[in-house]
């Protein structure tokens, strides 16, 4: 099943007839493969690891697939398709990345949902692109095209980075935040409660949904001998976490994982401010699987320590997989669940 934006792209696939195409920030479907019916070759760069895993089985000589915040080569394409990102701050980065990989006068195609901010695209396109032209408006989405009219500035990661000092209960740490990664430049309420009620951890610890590495940095500030692994599904988050570790002189293993599927060991501790907050049925299922997988990936005596919105139904699942529920602390918004396996 194609997303709405992908359906609009596919019905305009004559725009890429016999062309080499790069698809940036593709969604949870098989659109890159579908484009091969008209395009001569397709390369996809996913910023979401789950999206990458969905497409990976279809990789072929004319369909190359990558996960990350940049491509591993400087290859240039006839057309670059950009899915307008849900995090609007990421859009200028993607346009710069698109320009880097476009041939002179190459075609830019941008598709996105009306409610996601795509309507303002003509004002957002940088000057090295021509004025955006609206080609289609369907499925609550808009499709724009443009053309590269001059070379773009060199893409330097430091130009897209926010770096700031953060006070935590464990001490002050430096946080490096790339565009599109959640940040308030201060401790969000949930993480504040989590770190204010941090038990002493030991051995191998997993920071699930690490984001820019706030929890990891605080942990290592207090306990530099911990062996930490940091996982996230988002390429910009993983790059941010690596930069945060470097800025503080800390060491941890950072890698992409869809849930806990790509982890390969059992842990002495799992800590998280999990990125499931909206209470939708799909979110609840993901949260349930996270608790179950955490129990399966903890050693006997291992600690499961998370913060969650108090309205999310964690208690029953934790009781099922850990035998009991221990709420270590709570306020009017959040609960700290801290359970030993």
Curated annotation (Swiss-Prot):
GO terms for cellular component: cytoplasm. It comes from the Bacteria. Its EC number is 2.1.1.172. One of its GO terms (molecular function) is 16S rRNA (guanine(1207)-N(2))-methyltransferase activity. SUPFAM superfamilies: S-adenosyl-L-methionine-dependent methyltransferases. Pfam families: MTS, MTS_N. It is found in: Cytoplasm. Keywords: Cytoplasm, Methyltransferase, rRNA processing, S-adenosyl-L-methionine, Transferase. It catalyses: guanosine(1207) in 16S rRNA + S-adenosyl-L-methionine = N(2)-methylguanosine(1207) in 16S rRNA + S-adenosyl-L-homocysteine + H(+). Specifically methylates the guanine in position 1207 of 16S rRNA in the 30S particle. Monomer. This is Ribosomal RNA small subunit methyltransferase C.
């Amino acid at each position: 099943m194609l997303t709405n934006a992908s359906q609009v792209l596919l019905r305009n696939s004559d725009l890429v007839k016999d062309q080499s195409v790069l698809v940036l920030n593709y969604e949870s479907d098989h659109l890159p493969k579908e484009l091969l019916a008209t395009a001569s070759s397709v390369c996809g760069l996913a910023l979401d690891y789950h999206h990458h895993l969905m497409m990976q089985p279809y990789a072929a000589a004319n369909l190359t697939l990558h996960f990350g915040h940049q491509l591993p080569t400087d290859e240039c394409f006839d057309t670059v398709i950009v899915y307008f990102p849900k995090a609007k701050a990421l859009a200028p980065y993607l346009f710069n990345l698109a320009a880097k990989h476009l041939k002179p006068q190459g075609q830019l195609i941008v598709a996105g949902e009306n409610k996601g901010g795509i309507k303002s695209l003509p004002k957002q396109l940088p000057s090295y692109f021509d004025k955006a032209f609206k080609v289609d408006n369907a499925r609550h989405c808009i499709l724009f095209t443009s053309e590269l009219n001059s070379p773009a500035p060199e893409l330097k990661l430091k130009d897209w980075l926010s770096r700031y000092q953060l006070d935590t209960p464990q001490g002050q740490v430096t946080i490096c935040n790339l565009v599109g990664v959640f940040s308030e430049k201060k401790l969000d309420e949930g993480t504040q409660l989590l770190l204010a009620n941090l038990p002493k951890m030991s051995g191998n610890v997993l920071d699930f949904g690490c984001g820019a590495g706030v929890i990891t940095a605080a942990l290592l500030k207090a306990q530099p001998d911990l062996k930490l692994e940091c996982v996230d599904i988002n390429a910009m988050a993983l790059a941010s976490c690596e930069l945060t570790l470097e800025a503080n002189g800390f060491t941890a293993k950072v890698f992409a994982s869809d849930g806990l599927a790509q982890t390969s060991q059992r842990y002495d501790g799992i800590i998280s401010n999990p990125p499931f907050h909206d209470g939708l049925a799909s979110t609840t299922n993901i949260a349930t699987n996270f608790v179950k997988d955490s129990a399966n990936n903890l050693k006997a005596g291992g600690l499961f320590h998370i913060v969650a919105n108090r309205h999310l139904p964690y208690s029953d699942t934790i009781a099922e997989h850990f035998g009991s529920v221990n709420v270590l602390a709570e306020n009017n918004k959040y609960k700290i669940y801290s359970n030993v396996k």
